[in-house]
Amino acid sequence: IAGFIVLRLRGILGKRTGFEGKTPAQFENILKKVHQEKKTKQNENFDAVAQKEFLKGAKIAYETIITDFSDNDNKLIASKPLLSKKIFDEFNKALVERGQRGHFAEITFIGISSADIKEHKKLDKVLNVTVNFVSEIITCIRDKEKKIISGSPDKIKTIYDTWTFSRDISSNNPNWLLVDTLN
């Protein structure tokens, strides 16, 4: 009986031979449009779920950029993909100046106390999101002789930063760039 059922199903459904043909072009175009519309709607909606996901990434970016800026190799290797050209140039200039003075940073990132979206604006196809960060950092700047110029190697300092991230929502690139900083 089972063999009979299998043969009947095979006769009705057929078997795959590899020569079935492709989906008709008219359906491919419809599928592409549906996927594109869904993608566009997801990019344009910056709802509570999107904001929560954004803040997760923003916290990681914040810590990465702060610790990379404190690295004394003056390369900003980890941060470069997260920074707009303007911000990268500003940070790089500050690092070069610090190096020319013979100063080096000792920064220990303790953690982020809070990160809240202050505002988000869509301008054409670009979404800008401004975030208020409150973090705890131990920071100390030393000179060539290792004398402390500023900060303390033992004191945790509360830092208040306001950073603006930007992303072209029409792009397939999911990365956000840091485009502005205020302290």
Predicted regions and their residues:
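Juxtamembrane and targeting peptides
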Residues: I1-T64, I141-E145
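A composition-biased, non-transmembrane "mature-region" signal
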Residues: I5, G14, N45-I65, F69, ...
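Core segments of small alpha/beta cavity-forming domains
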Residues: H35-I112, D116-K118
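Structured, amphipathic secondary-structure segments that form assembly/contact surfaces
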Residues: K80-N183
